[in-house]
């Protein structure tokens, strides 16, 4: 279940996120909300809410 902040998107306060991994082939990072454990793909475009399956595919070395 997403927290209220994640329900409205990836936005400040950003200190609620922790970086789990970086994609060496693209400028993107796997971020996890400290409140609800939602996974986000932070990149140069619009951050994307990820399923665990999609996150494992994008970041195979990450501990999710």
Residue ranges and their predicted role:
Residues 19-23, 43-64:
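Short, intrinsically disordered terminal segments enriched in charged and Pro/Gly residues
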